[in-house]
Swiss-Prot record:
GO terms for cellular component: extracellular region. The lineage of its organism: Eukaryota, Metazoa, Spiralia, Lophotrochozoa, Mollusca. It is found in: Secreted. InterPro entries: 4Fe4S_Fe-S-bd (IPR017896), Conotoxin (IPR004214). This is Conotoxin TsMMSK-B022. Expressed by the venom duct. The cysteine framework is III (CC-C-C-CC). Classified in the M-2 branch, since 2 residues stand between the fourth and the fifth cysteine residues. It comes from the Eukaryota. Residues 21-50 form a propeptide.
Length: 67
C-alpha cells in the first residue's frame, strides 16, 4: 500500500510542474514580423531621437510616443 502511494506521489510531483509551467517556446512573440526583419526603431523615418519614440504610425514603429 505504501509503495503504491509513493509511486502515485512521485508521478504527481513529476507531472505537475511539467504541465503547470509554460516553456519559452510556448510564449507568443509580440511582433514576430518586426523581429524577423531585425527591426531597429532608430532607423525609422518617424523616430524622434529627442523623445526616443516614434511620432507617427505606431503599427510600423515602436515605441509609440504618447499623444
Amino acid at each position: 500500500m505504501m509503495s503504491k502511494l509513493g509511486v502515485l506521489l512521485t508521478i504527481c510531483l513529476l507531472l505537475f510542474p511539467l504541465t503547470a509551467v509554460q516553456l519559452d517556446g510556448d510564449q507568443p512573440a509580440d511582433l514576430p514580423e518586426l523581429r524577423a526583419q531585425d527591426f531597429a526603431p532608430e532607423r525609422s523615418p518617424w523616430f524622434d531621437p529627442v523623445r526616443r519614440c516614434c511620432s507617427q504610425d505606431c503599427r510600423v514603429c515602436i515605441p509609440c510616443c504618447p499623444y
